[in-house]
From Swiss-Prot:
Sorted UniProt keywords: Chaperone, Cytoplasm, DNA replication, Metal-binding, Repeat, Stress response, Zinc, Zinc-finger
Free-text domain note: The J domain is necessary and sufficient to stimulate DnaK ATPase activity. Zinc center 1 plays an important role in the autonomous, DnaK-independent chaperone activity of DnaJ. Zinc center 2 is essential for interaction with DnaK and for DnaJ activity.
Chain positions recorded as Zn(2+) 1 binding sites: C161, C164, C214, C217
Pfam family, one: DnaJ
Function: Participates actively in the response to hyperosmotic and heat shock by preventing the aggregation of stress-denatured proteins and by disaggregating proteins, also in an autonomous, DnaK-independent fashion. Unfolded proteins bind initially to DnaJ; upon interaction with the DnaJ-bound protein, DnaK hydrolyzes its bound ATP, resulting in the formation of a stable complex. GrpE releases ADP from DnaK; ATP binding to DnaK triggers the release of the substrate protein, thus completing the reaction cycle.
Coiled-coil annotated residue ranges, if any: none
Source species: Chlamydia felis (strain Fe/C-56)
A GO cellular component annotation in the UniProt record: cytoplasm
This protein's name: Chaperone protein DnaJ
Amino acid sequence: MDYYDVLGVSKTASPEEIKKAYRKLAVKYHPDKNPGDAEAEKRFKEVSEAYEVLSDAQKRESYDRYGKDGPFAGAGGFGGAGMGNMEDALRTFMGAFGGEFGGGGSFFEGLFGGLGEAFGMRGDPAGARQGASKKVHITLTFEEAARGVEKELLVSGYKTCTTCSGSGAANERGIKCCERCKGSGQIVQSRGFFSMASTCPECGGEGRIITDPCSNCRGQGRVKDKRNVHVQIPAGVDSGMRLKMEGYGDAGQNGAPSGDLYVFIDVEPHPVFERRGDDLILELPIGFVDAALGMKKEIPTLLKEGTCRLTVPEGIQSGTILKVKNQGFPNVHGRGRGDLLVRVSVETPQNLSEEQKELLRKFSSTEKAENFPKKRGFLDKIKGFFSDFTV
């Protein structure tokens, strides 16, 4: 039996052409469409065996070079048991049609694989499950968030058992392939046109049975652990951001990769600065004399220098914002820095002495309209309504 002839394709056929040919023939000879037809059942097994080999690049290369008795062949040829078992043929059928149900390697995985990922544990039909992802919260000071910092976290979870290297068995002879599911972890049953797969009750979906479990992990392949993890937090992070550390979650099972560690950031508020994106806002209260005459003032910053000199122009009004470029927060993606926005608040004096009041009265007597352009404009607008108003 030549596998290419069975599928009706050339030896140079692409993987897509091979899959297309198999799907057409598998549907044609599927037992649900041909109940009681022994010849159709035989053809279904043959096309499934051919597809199992030709759809695998490594097996196909070996088949092209050595034929059915190549180094990857089992006791019954490339199909393991020559596809004599209908269960194997149905499993191959589901694998070929699995991509239509979520892109998984089988019908069962296509339906249910996404749920495992949502909870941080991805699995395959042979029972290998990625370790669960972990999450921790870390609180930073405002300054630490601005400059970046390295933190050490204590993380509890599971690590790979060093005694058995994650196999769960005391030695190599302590593991055997599950005879019921032949290592797939699934039992395939025909339920209408699309066959269904269920977890193998013999091995619990693991695809293998541990006959001599490891004494350290009791057959689990991993043990509870607490470890210190060093986290390098970049400058510019903000509350609500998270860092992903691949492979720092729980150890996987049956050789599957470890989960990830997610570090959620909280940043404490600052008594002086307010953050808005990459910009910093500083409220600067000044007296009305400084507002009128202008001034130069040292103001705080988050840079190493600690301060910078700000020029307040004369005649500045309350609420005016002065921008100091590149004195804000660093961008977490390395795109420069934000600005320092200084919001001026002109404070009206309180608790004046008689001498101060007298000086203000003298100043008031010298006021001119051009000293208060907003006041003059306001009075001009309402002059027609209130005749007793004078300037």
